[in-house]
Swiss-Prot record:
NADP(+) binds at G166, A167, S168, I232. Homodimer. Keywords: Amino-acid biosynthesis, Histidine biosynthesis, Hydrolase, Methionine biosynthesis, Multifunctional enzyme, NADP, One-carbon metabolism, Oxidoreductase, Purine biosynthesis. One of its GO terms (molecular function) is methylenetetrahydrofolate dehydrogenase (NADP+) activity. One of its GO terms (cellular component) is cytosol. The gene is folD. This is Bifunctional protein FolD. Catalyzes the oxidation of 5,10-methylenetetrahydrofolate to 5,10-methenyltetrahydrofolate and then the hydrolysis of 5,10-methenyltetrahydrofolate to 10-formyltetrahydrofolate. Signal peptide: none annotated. GO terms for biological process: L-histidine biosynthetic process; methionine biosynthetic process; purine nucleotide biosynthetic process; tetrahydrofolate interconversion. Pathway: One-carbon metabolism; tetrahydrofolate interconversion. It catalyses: (6R)-5,10-methylene-5,6,7,8-tetrahydrofolate + NADP(+) = (6R)-5,10-methenyltetrahydrofolate + NADPH; (6R)-5,10-methenyltetrahydrofolate + H2O = (6R)-10-formyltetrahydrofolate + H(+). Its EC number is 1.5.1.5, 3.5.4.9. InterPro entries: Aminoacid_DH-like_N_sf, NAD(P)-bd_dom_sf, THF_DH/CycHdrlase, THF_DH/CycHdrlase_cat_dom, THF_DH/CycHdrlase_CS, THF_DH/CycHdrlase_NAD-bd_dom.
Length: 285
């Protein structure tokens, strides 16, 4: 068996095209384009690349992107004051703060300062809580993007055992909630999990967000499983690798997402989808 590839780039394109149509429809009806504020503190090269990708995607679909590139010397109070200002700006539907922030910032306070109806990253405790209560509004971008990928390939969720490796607030925890909402039986593995292989080998749907290249050996993959690899790791030769041994896993899985070109594009596509949703649902004018 050789796995079919889940083409995140192609699926993301269908989402961005749908968002672009939604933006055009708003404008045709005499409404303003959605607005997204993107805040970057400091000059971390990886963060600059991610922010650039988000801004370009916004422009491509007609969303008004407002950039705030702040120096590394910015204080927590200054950042919170900017968020307060954007919370009150009627032309801004979403506020995105690029993480990680430089040392000295309290990330939780920053997340909680963003109004829940402008939290297009889906990180605010209010939005995560709504997902846990099965009444989601703005949903965390990477987990929601993965659900979109699974839906696109026709995944049957009910009765399936979904295993999530990683328990971060950004991916692992909301991913478990999304899969639970979809009807899966879920297991979340983390650094205190003993006998990780035991759980991975049971997974009909496996989502790995560990941040370590080739962390999951191919021989652990259940035959016929669907594998979503969130990791993106740069190897010594400069190439990129996921958290799953792709070469080994694709010989056992039915479906697998590649790195790059898998989950990554879906995160950005879901961000702009959230921005249009916030505009239409909460701030439409």
């Amino acid at each position: 068996m050789t796995a079919q590839i889940i083409d995140g780039k192609a699926i993301a394109t269908t989402i961005t095209e749908r968002v672009a149509k939604g933006v055009k429809l708003r404008i045709a009806n005499g409404l303003r384009a959605p607005g997204l504020a993107v805040i970057l503190v400091g000059g971390d090269p990886a963060s600059q690349i991610y922010v650039g990708s988000k801004r370009r995607t916004c422009e491509a679909v007609g969303i008004h992107s407002k950039a705030f590139d702040l120096p590394e010397t910015t204080t927590q109070d200054e950042l919170l004051a900017l968020i307060d200002k954007l919370n009150d700006d009627p032309d801004i539907d979403g506020i995105l703060v690029q993480f990680p922030l430089p040392d000295g910032f309290d990330q939780t306070s920053v997340i909680e300062r963003i109004k829940p109806d402008k939290d297009v990253d889906g990180f605010h405790p209010y939005n995560v809580g709504r997902l846990a209560q099965r009444i989601p509004l703005l949903r965390s971008c990477t987990p929601r993007g993965i659900i979109s990928m699974l839906e696109y390939i026709g995944t049957e969720f009910h009765g399936k055992h979904a295993v999530v490796v990683g328990a971060s607030n950004i991916v692992g925890r909301p991913m478990t909630l999304e899969l639970l909402l979809a009807g899966c039986t879920t297991t979340t593995c983390h650094r205190f999990t003993t006998d990780l292989a035991h759980y991975v080998k049971q997974a009909d749907i496996l989502v790995v967000a560990r941040g370590k290249a080739n962390f999951i050996p191919g021989e652990w993959i259940k035959k016929g499983a669907t594998v979503l690899d969130v990791g993106i790791n740069r190897l010594e030769d400069g190439s990129l690798a996921g958290d799953v041994d792709f070469a080994g896993a694709k010989e056992r899985a039915a479906w697998i997402s590649p790195v790059p070109g898998g989950v990554g594009p879906m995160t950005v596509a879901t961000l702009i989808e959230n921005t249009l949703f916030a505009c239409n649902e909460f701030h439409s004018q």
